[in-house]
Amino acid sequence: MGSQLALKSRIRSTESLAKIFNAQEMIASSHIAKARDVALNAKPYTDAIFDAVQALVAHTHITHPIAVKDEKNPRVAVLALTSDRGMAGPYTSSIIRETESLLSRLDAAGKQPELFVYGRRGSTYYKYRNRDIAATWEGDTDQPGVEIAETISNTLMDAYMKPAEKGGVSELYIVYTEFINMVVQKVRVLRMLPVEIVKNETKVPDPDEEAPATADVAPLYTFEPSLEKVLDAILPKYIQSRIHECLLTAAASETASRQNACLLY
């Protein structure tokens, strides 16, 4: 009799879990299309900002912090984008694994990484292991807004622009999950600052060939009031747009991972 009651209890528990997973899968499937579209729609703006920054920092003799790293300052900032909720398969564990790998590489290189965490699951993981965390943010990791991107970017900007003797950092890294499609999401490590110049391949022009189109010729810029002032103005927009894009593609990845995980049960 006792064994029958135990079996019935297990059956009821299994049925309850199945209902929970089914509900989670339905919620995730209703969110994924919007999350994917929002992430894709934000990309052109971020790409335009990045192209503008690339054009600015490509100028020689630039000494602005956006492009020049303080080699004497070993402190670097690492932002890990995790999730608030579970039931998302290996989503958060993959981010934590890559973050730990990055922290180890930075330590081996003589750096002093400072950890910033977005998402309750990640902050709980590191707090449980008594890891020092410079700052944490929680709430709406599957639907991040511009406000949280601005808050995070302001904190990281303050850390980056602060002098080394006052605890500033010389580099900014972000660990996030890029949404490829519903099945594939890849963990990425992006160094946001200093900006790395992406150089295009060039070749010596042939006199017999036609001149390149105007779109292929690098434009000449005149900066008013100065290049440094322009960089001061564009730097906050660059950081916020990059972080916002990472938050959006991470949210789409989290939702897709949650839907896929629930489908397995």
Task: Give the predicted meaning of each segment.
Residues 265:
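Conserved small/polar residues in nucleotide/adenosyl-binding loops
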